[in-house]
C-alpha cells in the first residue's frame, strides 16, 4: 500500500511547489511595479533634484516656488473673417509662420486686422511672421523652444523664390521675415535672407517687409548685406538686459554685439530699426533703463516689452509676472527717451501689430513730427540749462 501512496504524495508536493514557484514571483513583481509607479507619481520632479533642495524625509509635489499664471495672461480663442482667411491661405501657400508654431498669444490681434474692416482690408492691415531657413537652430537660448542642432538640414535653394511668390499672392500689406540662427553657414544665411527680401520687392513692391535677423556672429558685412536688400524695417532683439544676457541667451550672443548689429543697420540707411526686451527674467529697473539708453545711443526707433513665458519645464523659470501697470510705465519711459514707437504689455511680442505701427506712424508722417517735437524739447532744455549756468 505504501508503495502506491508514495508517488501520489510526491506528485502532490511537487505540484504545490510548482504552484508556489509560479505565483510568488509574479505577485512580488506586480507589487514592486505598483510601488515603483506610485513613487514616480508622488516623488520629487527633475527640477527638484537639480535644485537639490528637497528634504529626504518628505515629498514635494511640483514647483511650489513658481509664481502662478495671472488671469491677464490668459487669452481667448482667435476668430474673425480675416483670421480664418489667412489661416486657410497658409495651408494652400505652404508657408510656415512663427505665429502658429510658437503659439503666439497675439495671433488673433495680428491676423484679425482692423475691427469692422472688410476681408481684403483686414488682410492688408494684418501682420504675419514667416520663418526662413528651416526650423532647427544652431544656438540654444534658455528661453526659446525652437529645436537645436549643430548640423541642421541644408538650405532649400528654392525657398526665396517660392516664399516671394506665395507672399505676393497672399495679399498682406506687411510681412515679417525671421529665421533660426545658422552658425553652420559661412554667411549665417545672410545671402539667403537678402535674396528672399529682394524677390518679394520685385514681385510686390507695395508689400512692406520687416526682417528680424540674428546677429550673424557679429559679422557686420553680413548685416549690411541684409540691410541693403530693400527691406523697410530692420529688427534684431536684444532679448534682455546686459547683465542677464549670459544667463538668458546662447553664450555666442552678447549685448554689445547686438547693439553693433542695430547700429550698422541704421548706418546703412534703414529708416526704422527695432528691438524687443523680455521682462520677468530677473532684471532690475536700473538695468532696463540702462538698456534703453544704450539702444537710443545707436538710434533704435522702436522697442517692444513683453512678459517672458516659460515654454516647457526644461527652460528657465519665470522670475516674476510683471503687472500691466508696470508695462505702461515702461512705455512712457521709453517714449520720453525718444523712441518713435513703443509696444508694451504682458502679451506683446516682437512683431506685435508691426504693420499697423508702420502704416499709421511712419507712412503718415507721425513719426517725423514726433521726432521733431522731441528734438525741439531737447533744444529748449539745453538753452535753459545754458542760460541758468550764465
UniProtKB/Swiss-Prot annotation:
Feature: transit peptide: 1-18
Pfam families in the cross-refs: LIAS_N (PF16881), Radical_SAM (PF04055)
Domain of life: Eukaryota
EC number: 2.8.1.8
Keywords annotated in UniProt: 4Fe-4S, Iron, Iron-sulfur, Metal-binding, Mitochondrion, S-adenosyl-L-methionine, Transferase, Transit peptide
Required co-factors: [4Fe-4S] cluster
GO molecular function annotation: 4 iron, 4 sulfur cluster binding; lipoate synthase activity; metal ion binding
InterPro entries membership: Aldolase_TIM (IPR013785), Elp3/MiaA/NifB-like_rSAM (IPR006638), LIAS_N (IPR031691), Lipoyl_synth (IPR003698), rSAM (IPR007197)
Main location class: mitochondrion
SMART domains: Elp3 (SM00729)
Cell compartment(s), UniProt: Mitochondrion
GO cellular component assignments: mitochondrion
Residues the entry annotates as binding [4Fe-4S] cluster 2: 137, 141, 144
Reaction(s) the record says it catalyses: [[Fe-S] cluster scaffold protein carrying a second [4Fe-4S](2+) cluster] + N(6)-octanoyl-L-lysyl-[protein] + 2 oxidized [2Fe-2S]-[ferredoxin] + 2 S-adenosyl-L-methionine + 4 H(+) = [[Fe-S] cluster scaffold protein] + N(6)-[(R)-dihydrolipoyl]-L-lysyl-[protein] + 4 Fe(3+) + 2 hydrogen sulfide + 2 5'-deoxyadenosine + 2 L-methionine + 2 reduced [2Fe-2S]-[ferredoxin]
Stretches assigned to the Radical SAM core domain: 120-340
Family: Belongs to the radical SAM superfamily. Lipoyl synthase family.
Name under which the protein is recorded: Lipoyl synthase, mitochondrial
Organism, as annotated: Coprinopsis cinerea (strain Okayama-7 / 130 / ATCC MYA-4618 / FGSC 9003) (Inky cap fungus)
